[in-house]
């Protein structure tokens, strides 16, 4: 497994520092990270999968006060110049997700949501956990870690290699509808 480049580590550190600072700021009772049934979250941010940088875009829909389903598209930059073939398509993965939200069970402040769940994608399937912090009624931040356990679809063994067995870290912004 390749190590993260120093630039990627620094960017991740910046995002985590920003998230930590915002968590320490007094929050408004109006902002809610998890509204329960019918809540829709759209999120976008930086993604790092096994040392490869990229981005992700996703959405969650709350089926109940505790359970949500959604989808996410992740792209990481895949460079493979040695074989002279275009490998850019290998960097994409679309996943369906299911999460359990712990905010009510753990009696967390309304601006904070901790969740865990599963994801099944075109490239890999695995487990995930994350946290959301809303600093306003509409906008917030998120951080998520996903461990891709197994390769899912595709005949080409190389397609699964980008995601299979890799840890994915992501941070970014959320919008509540």
Predicted features and spans:
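Gram-negative (and chloroplast) outer-membrane scaffold detector with strong preference
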Residues: 60-139
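Low-complexity, intrinsically disordered Gly/Pro/Thr-rich segments
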Residues: 149-160
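Flexible, solvent-exposed coil segments and beta strand-coil junctions
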Residues: 35-39, 107-113, 152-154
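Outer-membrane beta-barrel pore domains and translocons
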Residues: 43-49, 74-76, 101, 119-123, ...
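Cleavable N-terminal export/targeting peptides
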Residues: 1-37, 177
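Outer-membrane beta-barrel "beta-signal"
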Residues: 94-100, 164-177
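Short glycine/proline- and aromatic-enriched beta-strand/turn motifs that initiate or cap beta-hairpins
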Residues: 27-69, 96-98, 103, 176
């Amino acid at each position: 497994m390749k190590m993260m480049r120093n630039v990627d580590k620094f960017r991740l550190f910046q995002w985590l520092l920003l998230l930590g600072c915002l968590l320490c700021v007094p929050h408004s009772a109006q902002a809610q990270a998890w509204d329960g049934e019918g809540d829709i979250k759209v999120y976008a941010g930086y993604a790092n999968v096994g040392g490869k940088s990229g981005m992700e875009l996703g959405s969650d829909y709350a089926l109940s006060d505790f359970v949500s389903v959604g989808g996410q598209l992740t792209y990481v930059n895949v460079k493979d110049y040695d074989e002279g073939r275009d490998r850019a398509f290998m960097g994409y993965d679309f996943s369906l997700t299911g999460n359990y939200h712990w905010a009510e069970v753990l009696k967390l402040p309304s601006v904070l949501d901790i969740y865990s769940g599963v994801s099944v994608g075109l490239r890999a399937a695995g487990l995930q956990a994350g946290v959301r912090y809303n600093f306003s009624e509409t906008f917030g931040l998120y951080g998520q870690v996903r461990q891709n356990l197994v390769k899912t679809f595709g005949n080409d063994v190389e397609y699964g290699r980008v995601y299979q067995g890799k840890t994915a870290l992501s941070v970014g912004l959320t919008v509540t509808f």
